[in-house]
Amino acid sequence: MNEKTRKNISAAGLLIAIGIVYGDIGTSPLYVMKSIVAGNGGIANVNRDFIVGSISLVLWTVTLLTTLQTVFIALKATNHGEGGIFALYTLVRKRAKWLVLPALIGGAAILADGTLTPAVTVTTAIEGLKGIEFGHGNVPVSTQGTVIAITVVILLLLFSIQRMGTSIIGKAFGPIMFIWFTFLGVIGLMNMMGDLSILQALNPYYAIKLLFSPYNKAGIFILGSIFLATTGAEALYSDVGHVGKGNIIGSWPYVFVCLSLNYFGQGVWILNNPNYNAGNGDFNPFFEIIPQNIRLAAIVLATIAAVIASQALITGSFTLVAEASGLKFLPRMNIMYPSTKKGQIYIPSVNKMICAATIAIVLFFQTSAHMEAAYGLSITISMLMTTILLYEWLAMKGVHTIWNWLFLIFFGFLDVMFMLASLSKFMHGGYVSLVIAGFIGIIMYVWYYGNKIRDKRESRNAYVRLDEYVDMLTNLSHDEDYPTFATNLVYMAKVKYNKFIKREILYSILDKRPKRARAYWFVTVNVTNEPFTAEYAVNTYGTKNVINVQLFLGFKQQTSVNVYLRQIVHDLIADGTIESQPQEYTTTPGRDVGDFSFVIVNDVISPQTQLRSYEKFLVEARVWLQNLSSNPASWFGLDYADTVIERVPLILGNQRRQHITRIPPKKFEDIKKKLQAEGELKE
């Protein structure tokens, strides 16, 4: 750990990291050993070699994939403090165009996992309540239906508090998760003391031996259950922008030790209870290692930890979606910043979609055992894609070719093995995660390549120099042959390099129907890295009625363009930059600012567009997604302003020329007589 990273570590930061980042991997003990034993036919079909080998596989999987690959390597690959597969892609995308594919596939897989993690963890924890007596023989949670109802209520509450932001949530969750990991370690240690020979699992020999052992009925496919122990490693990388690299590195050793002790404790309990019979068929060694007199309190704590586990994926999903939108993988969405840190975000639409998908999964699968079959597959895919991108990042950083290839071969082999093992769950529920990932991936593919085709095929004169049209706009402003469209005609249009603007904007003013206005405003909104910036700059091109406004707004500042622009007009009138706009008819005496009309231009594919059918489909699908997902008036704070949405033709590629020939009058008369004779034309 370098000096800079060490300085960024604080007690509060460590607590927030434990509360936000480790929830997913921290609840793995709830279901990993349960899944492993069930996959081998139950507790009656396991022996010492199987348990020691299984725990060895778990520990070394977490060591290699979480500690080595994620904490020691991936956390170094951050983009301005942000982590995750999209941030990694941003660092390496100039090395090869095809690298966009692993980024799209991996990102879609992680977002799909965000719907499964809350469902699995919360359901597993609540299932621990089944059969627990409250008072004198009262068993309120006796059926799976009750478990599902409680799970759905908890999930609804979880998603409803997301608007509070990760800072507030982390402060509340951090101490609880610290207690949770301490509890895992203490309970595990208490059981482990009954048979310290379980520490043989630290030797990787037993892990490799189990893969080829006749006692292992699942064979190599046992890795599908083993991999569940490291789900959540991707959250460490995705959430680095929320809590900081130093706090993740500083807190991981404690978390890893506590997890290891709990797995050891569960292993010893299984070895000491070979004839255990759950009676009702519900067997979970995690709850069995807990003394009966504190089991109810432990289940409550496990439920809270499960809720926090879901938080890691939800916050990670917000970060990934924001990055995807910036990379033009996804449409623009309304992003909110609950705190003064730009890395901590909340996206209402994403929150609603994940909530709906998670609850649907709970209602569809009904039990945690069924959900576990769907869990993990999408994450193995994302980890393989991350490995490919990390290989490119290491090469970019100048790592020796031999070491770089060793990294790719070693971790690529591990990822492929876990992915193949997880594919064995496909027909038992794994298809659900792939369907969700596929749906997200298709949207990303359409949006990204639709934009690429549009940019490539768009006419070279798509952008024009605004300053070359200043005289024309000034003349139109004073031309009384045209009715006044508005006193202030405002276009929400980006002006690049202070002079280039899309031709469609000027087409809207001059060609569709000349729009006469006293002043033409072209407004560009620039979001800064500071939370509360509110500044502007103007360029009038030497006129008093053509104004290019560059707004610089902090990421927490409301984008109320309507309000800001009125203040800007007052400022410019006061210093003589533009002329006063006195109003004869007004409810405000002395008002010197006229009315505003805001115009937002939307593209429509022109029939004249010449593209290959596949390209045209992608561009049309991209435009459809834009119209479905966007609300520009809301983005710019124009909900209650006079806003006009205009559609202009988007002509891509070579234009299709359609010719019509004029015929002489005599020929027309001959055609007319012929049609009348045939009865096709009546007098």
From Swiss-Prot:
Where is this protein chiefly located? membrane
> Per the record, what is one GO cellular component?
plasma membrane
Subcellular location per the Swiss-Prot or TrEMBL entry: Cell membrane
Q: Which Pfam families match?
A: K_trans (PF02705), K_trans_C (PF22776)
Reaction catalysed? K(+)(in) + H(+)(in) = K(+)(out) + H(+)(out)
Q: Which family does it belong to?
A: Belongs to the HAK/KUP transporter (TC 2.A.72) family.
Q: Which InterPro entries match?
A: K+_transporter, K_trans_C, K_trans_N, Kup
Q: How does it sit in the membrane?
A: Multi-pass membrane protein
Q: What is this protein called in UniProt? A: Probable potassium transport system protein Kup 1
Q: Where are the transmembrane segments?
A: 13-33, 55-75, 98-118, 139-159, 168-188, 218-238, 251-271, 296-316, 345-365, 376-396, 401-421, 426-446
Lineage here is: Bacteria, Bacillati, Bacillota, Bacilli, Lactobacillales
Keywords noted in UniProt: Cell membrane, Ion transport, Membrane, Potassium, Potassium transport, Symport, Transmembrane, Transmembrane helix, Transport
Question: What is the stated purpose of this protein?
Answer: Transport of potassium into the cell. Likely operates as a K(+):H(+) symporter.
Any one GO MF term held by the record is:
potassium ion transmembrane transporter activity
